[in-house]
């Protein structure tokens, strides 16, 4: 596994990802583990781990709250980095290339492990992707944490509304109903089974989600393209069309 002394991590800004940071601290103390660096958009929870001595260095490409901003001014090992230093795929020194574990959120994830963090289930823009696809591609272990359903809306779907991060970059999906491991990572699957965690296929999670919410009706679009989704290398991997 990667949860060893000197590991590196990034957590996303979704509620589930932030909760992981809080619970991880207790396990780090119990196991006497300290992280070499924490990366990405920095939040109060990451600052807390840093100030407790659990994360040696914070590499900050974006402060997400006032606590992080204040920390940047007073903690010498809380260091500001540029987006180029953070995740430029053409740079040999990009920080994401040194990541052991990244924990990300998702609006949708489909049965091919493709992830959507841009558009909602109604096809309308909801937010930005930040370094989602960059960290997912570069980290040694990429974990998506999300609820199986949000109200009446399934998170695990047949096909994502918009593909932001290709499924080939996602290793594990953790939901409140079970854990799915990408078949491309059989060694990760073995670790999860050995730990007696509730592992199931992503298709089973999809069926369970639909049994609770029903299968969503297809969104109707016009032919007008209102957004172009570029992957980290600049290639176009999807488009967003105007909803009727």
Predicted regions located by residue number:
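Beta-strand-loop-alpha "switch" segments that mediate conformational coupling across diverse proteins
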Residues: 14
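Conserved phosphate- and dinucleotide-binding cores of soluble alpha/beta proteins
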Residues: 1-8, 19-28, 32-36, 44-244
């Amino acid at each position: 596994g990667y949860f060893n002394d000197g590991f590196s991590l990034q957590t996303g800004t979704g509620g589930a990802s932030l909760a992981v940071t809080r619970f991880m601290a207790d396990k780090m103390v119990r196991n006497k583990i300290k992280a070499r660096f924490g990366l990405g958009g920095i939040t109060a929870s990451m600052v807390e781990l840093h100030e407790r001595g659990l994360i040696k260095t914070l590499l900050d490409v974006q402060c997400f709250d006032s606590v992080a901003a204040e920390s940047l001014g007073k903690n010498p090992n809380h260091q500001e980095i540029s987006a180029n230093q953070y995740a430029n795929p053409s740079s040999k020194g990009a920080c994401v290339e040194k990541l052991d574990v990244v924990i990300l959120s998702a609006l949708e994830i489909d049965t091919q492990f493709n992830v959507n963090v841009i558009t909602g289930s109604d096809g309308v823009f909801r937010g930005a992707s930040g370094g989602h696809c960059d960290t997912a591609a570069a980290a040694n272990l990429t974990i998506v944490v999300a609820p199986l359903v949000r109200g009446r809306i399934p998170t695990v779907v047949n096909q994502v509304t918009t593909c932001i991060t290709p499924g080939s970059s996602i290793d594990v999906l953790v939901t409140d109903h079970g854990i799915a491991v990408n078949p491309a990572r059989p060694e990760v699957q073995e670790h999860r089974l050995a730990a007696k965690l509730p592992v199931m296929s992503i298709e089973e999670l999809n069926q369970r989600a639909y049994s609770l919410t029903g299968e969503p009706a297809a969104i109707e679009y016009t032919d007008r393209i209102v957004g172009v989704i570029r992957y980290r290398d600049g290639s176009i991997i999807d488009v967003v069309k105007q909803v009727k």
